[in-house]
Amino acid sequence: NGPKLFQLYIHKDKGLTDNLIERCKKSGFNSMCLTVDAVVAGNRERDHRTGFSTPPRLTLSSLLSFALHPRWSLNYLFRKKFELSNIIHTTDKGSKIDQSVMNYMNEQFETKMNWSDAEYCVKKWGGPFALKGVMSVEDAKKAIDIGCTAIIISNHGGRQLDGSRAPFDQLSEIVDAVGDKIEVILDGGVRRGTH
């Protein structure tokens, strides 16, 4: 019964983006957040160390892990087919191998989005709208210009944008510049960082 916010990623298939926005309206979501701080895949060091991949690759190490964990292995082989509800109508319906969904997401996430894309989503939504990934005063001002009602200062936990400044370091200058014109939220998630 509480407020609901939908975190949106722009897709190359604009019909899918439109469909998600319309479904959120019909489902009673109160606000929308467009994520712009994850245009590159995260540096998942643990996955590199363990050899994790999607779909799983059969290596000597993974075969040993499957053999040592028979319950997990059987669950993987005989579980309900994986579905990503938001896009199930656009992928191979319930493929046992997660590759169809992963390939779709890799092909469909828009890495070249621009301010026109963001403004389109703000207008299409027509309600409270946050832009997540703002890291400069200039971008905060532009978010106001396109109609956002909130910004989220974020670098996606440092995993995607590890070389950027920390959101906390951006907070005071952004709040000083636009804090009286737009709601400013600081993303508190920090997974890692080198700076």
Feature annotation, model-predicted:
Residues 1-17:
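A gly/proline- and charged-residue-enriched helix-loop-helix capping module
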Residues 2-5, 27, 60-61, 111-129, ...:
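Alpha-helix-loop-beta-strand connector modules within alpha/beta enzyme cores
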Residues 4-8, 32, 129-132, 152-153, ...:
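Hydrophobic faces of well-ordered beta-strands that scaffold small-molecule active sites
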Residues 17-20, 43-49:
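Short acidic, glycine/serine/threonine-rich loops at helix termini
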Residues 18-21, 135-147, 176-180, 184-186, ...:
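Catalytic cores of alpha/beta
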Residues 34, 121, 143, 151, ...:
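Conserved, mostly hydrophobic/aromatic
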Residues 36-42, 148-164, 192:
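Glycine-rich phosphate-binding active-site loops on the catalytic face of alpha/beta enzymes
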Residues 48-114:
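Terminal interaction modules at protein C-ends
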